[in-house]
From Swiss-Prot:
Keywords: Metal-binding, Nickel, Zinc. InterPro entries: Hydgase_Ni_incorp_HypA/HybF_CS (IPR020538), HypA/HybF (IPR000688). Transmembrane segments: none annotated. Signal peptide: none annotated. This is Hydrogenase maturation factor HypA.
Length: 122
């Protein structure tokens, strides 16, 4: 279950950023999760809530944005690979235009803290 370790890393990252910016409270956190990470957003959100207890993050709203897989194929196709075309147990993807596997993945592998909204000291 790599969701736990990823949620822990997110919590540590947000706490570190909040402390560096003299926050008294974290109000909202937006996280981007790429489809190819195979992370379950519902599990991540649950673990973020649990790991936030007793910290500056407790009570914060977590917004999880799923980033679709975008490819650039040798055939010239540039765009999104639809989620229903992905096998979530083994993320083998192919170009929807030519069926090929020779492409560059432009998006969908990331897991980033995109935005943190804090309450600062007066």
């Amino acid at each position: 279950m790599h969701e736990l370790s990823m949620a822990d890393a997110i919590v540590r990252t947000v706490i570190d950023a909040a402390e560096k910016n003299d926050a008294v409270e974290v109000l909202e956190v937006t996280v981007e999760i790429g489809q190819l990470t195979l992370l379950n957003p519902e599990q991540i959100e649950f673990m973020l809530d649990v790991l936030s207890e007793g910290t500056i993050l407790e009570g914060a709203r977590f917004n999880l944005e799923v980033v679709p897989v975008e490819i650039e194929c040798e055939c010239g196709y540039e765009g999104v690979v639809e989620a229903d075309e992905l096998d979530h147990f083994a993320p083998v993807i192919k170009c929807p235009a030519c069926g090929g596997h020779e492409f560059h993945v432009r998006a969908g592998r990331e897991c980033n803290v995109k935005n943190i909204k804090i309450e600062k000291k007066d």
